[in-house]
């Protein structure tokens, strides 16, 4: 666990491009409506940084919260349909507020709504990358949110923390700032005087034994401290320095002041956005078990998973779903997007692709999981294949 301010924290003030994520609890009143004063304070900070020459992207939650009051909801809805209804009402209200506040600084706000699928598919990924990059070039401030109205339970971020980390990767940002309602990561309950602020995290090993618990206090947002730390991990694996602190510390964090918790970025090759999503932002819909030869091929040789190496299937999933790849003892070794329904795989197990093509047709000679749709999990980190 780090005890001091890292050398790279001071470089935040010179960052060329920053992504700032703010959660619902930092934008709303105790009653759940939009807090215009908080939004104004945040836009003042971001406008100040933008005018200093830094490209700024804001990932903002709050659409569901903003839509609650107009729909007569007193508590955040738990079912997806009502969440989507609230988001469809609230997203326009949220953007209108940001547009008005940034206009005070002669800046233009631009709405970007993304789904996990947009960052999983190469063409959509590139389109999102080009659109946001162009907005930054012409001086606008992209405001990103998950497209809650069309996202599904199966393929969604569920909170904007992980979305922010993947956007930081997509845009090759220098810094990610995660703003929440606590001032830092602590080694215990932050409300207890015995808890100590963690000033710097150099790697996952620094958090072994730390009880992350939940930072949610008001029931407005969806992300707790666990998802924020996971998002910091995604970003730092992509080489993006990350600061976790409260919205009240936004200005200080962007100056590189020693506030909050600083997560030191990794220095290895950047993984692809798809690999980061598979490793960190989704759960397997089922499991495919591999024999030792297949484990070696997938993990060491970075090969695709072929039917011949499969020994068992568990769960109910469809082609295109993420699945966990496990060795014969059940140890998770990789995760990938499967090419077959779970009901189809038992008839393919142990067979060569040549036999399958001859007996069942060419459509059954495909890999179970193609190497381009697969991420090897080693001690919780992604493999070092080329970034997309």
Swiss-Prot record:
Biological classification of the source: Bacteria, Bacillati, Actinomycetota, Actinomycetes, Streptosporangiales
NCBIfam families with a match to the protein in the record: proB
Family recorded in the similarity comment: Belongs to the glutamate 5-kinase family.
Protein name: Glutamate 5-kinase
Domain (PUA): residue spans on this chain: 285-363
UniProt-listed Gene3D superfamilies: Acetylglutamate kinase-like (3.40.1160.10), PUA domain (2.30.130.10)
Organism of this sequence: Thermobifida fusca (strain YX)
Main location, first listed in the record: cytoplasm
Any single biological process term in GO: L-proline biosynthetic process
Compartments where located: Cytoplasm
Binding site for substrate: 61, 148, 160
